[in-house]
């Protein structure tokens, strides 16, 4: 990124000259985290749980620690697929994704309880695995706060057992 600090180029017939003074590369989701107004001090972990991946960054006073940034192919979509299969297996019915998403977001939906139960069991297992993966990377809830962003935050909020003083859903 800083190989060429002095750049000349043309765009729409106009000539431009740009000097790059400095550049930083931060984990996905960092912008949402850094703009969070809450009191963020000391050792923290940022987990950005998106559709396809979970990005994890260990931080010290809001700054990512070099060598402590990880990406797992373990996003909400993996949970969605398992929930869809579980409903099919238990209820012999295909449930549209938007209903599963509603259960993920709200913890419930206007469907029979057996469907909610099947989806919820998968979601509970998924969030247990999320916390397990975080611990594998070095997350210790006694020593660090966890900040969760992305769609997976709804799953944590609705289906995980956690200390709300130590886990913040942004």
Question: Which residues does each PLM region occupy?
Answer:
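Active-site-adjacent segment of 2-oxoglutarate/Fe(II) JmjC oxygenases
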Residues: 86-98
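Nucleotide/phosphate-binding catalytic cleft detector across ATP-hydrolyzing
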Residues: 1-46, 65-78, 98-170
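Short beta-strand scaffold segments in enzyme catalytic cores
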Residues: 54-58
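Active-site-proximal alpha-helical scaffolds that flank and shape metal-associated catalytic sites
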Residues: 47-51
């Amino acid at each position: 990124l800083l190989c060429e600090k002095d750049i000349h180029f043309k765009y729409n017939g106009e000539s431009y000259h740009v000097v790059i003074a400095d550049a930083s590369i931060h984990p996905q989701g960092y912008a949402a985290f850094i703009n969070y107004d809450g009191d963020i001090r000391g050792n923290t972990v940022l987990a950005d749980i998106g559709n396809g991946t979970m990005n994890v960054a260990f931080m010290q006073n809001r700054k990512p620690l070099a060598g402590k940034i990880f990406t797992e192919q373990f996003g909400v979509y993996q949970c969605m697929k398992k929930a869809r299969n579980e409903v099919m297996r238990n209820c012999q019915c295909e449930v549209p994704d938007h209903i599963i998403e509603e259960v993920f977001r709200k913890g419930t939906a206007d469907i029979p309880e057996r469907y909610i139960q099947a989806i919820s069991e998968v979601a509970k297992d998924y969030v247990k695995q999320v916390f397990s993966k975080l611990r594998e990377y070095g997350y210790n809830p006694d020593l660090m706060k966890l900040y969760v962003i992305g769609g997976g935050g709804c799953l944590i909020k609705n289906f995980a057992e956690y200390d709300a003083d130590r886990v913040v859903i942004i």
